[in-house]
Amino acid sequence: MGDPKRQRKKYETPPHPWIKERLDRERVLMDKYELKNKKELWKHETQLKNFRRRARRLLAARGKQAEIEREQLLSRLKRLGLLPEDAVLDDVLSLTVEDILERRLQTIVYKKGLARTMRQARQLIVHGHIEVNGQIIRSPSYLVLKEEEDKITYARTSPFANPQHPERMMIEKAKQGGEA
């Protein structure tokens, strides 16, 4: 029957390993979004690069098929919450890697106040305490769809589902302290 398809890397490494400006920029993003390693950042940069490459190709292309692909690309990015509903193809070129990092499950769990820190958000996700739309997701890099954003909660099977859980009470207290 043949061999299974070869697994390919989902990221591209930088062309030169020691460019100080890139290293500084990566360090800031790694600290801000509590990424585990550079590979996580490179995956999202490659994703962005591919979106932008497709947009540039489609801007130059003419024809019925190009129009269909334009609509597909725009609808995907709108569903992911990377673009507003009234966006055009030129807006894809202005996306940054931070826009993609803001859509990660880890970031959204932290911003919704389900965790005190980004690191705790990552731990809650990996340990199976967070569910999206009734489904436990264990990948912090999961890109949350716009319609799923309000369906992120503690998992029903998690001890955190109990509002009286001591850690959850500390999270609520930290949330109250941040608002005051």
From Swiss-Prot:
Q: Domain (S4 RNA-binding): give its ranges.
A: 103-174
Indicate yes or no for the key word Phosphoprotein: no
What Gene Ontology terms describe where this protein resides (cellular component)? small ribosomal subunit
How does it associate, per the subunit comment? Part of the 30S ribosomal subunit. Contacts protein S5. The interaction surface between S4 and S5 is involved in control of translational fidelity.
What does the entry give for GO biological process? Answer: ribosomal small subunit biogenesis; translation
The family line of this record is: Belongs to the universal ribosomal protein uS4 family.
**InterPro entries on file:** Ribosomal_uS4 (IPR022801), Ribosomal_uS4_arc (IPR022802), Ribosomal_uS4_CS (IPR018079), Ribosomal_uS4_euk/arc (IPR005710), Ribosomal_uS4_N (IPR001912), S4_RNA-bd (IPR002942), S4_RNA-bd_sf (IPR036986)
Q: Which organism is it from?
A: Pyrococcus horikoshii (strain ATCC 700860 / DSM 12428 / JCM 9974 / NBRC 100139 / OT-3)
Q: Which GO terms describe its molecular function?
A: rRNA binding; structural constituent of ribosome
Alphabetical UniProt keywords:
Ribonucleoprotein, Ribosomal protein, RNA-binding, rRNA-binding
Please state the span of the N-terminal signal peptide per the UniProt entry: none
Superkingdom assignment: Archaea
Q: What protein name does the entry list?
A: Small ribosomal subunit protein uS4
Q: Which cysteines are joined by disulfide bonds?
A: none
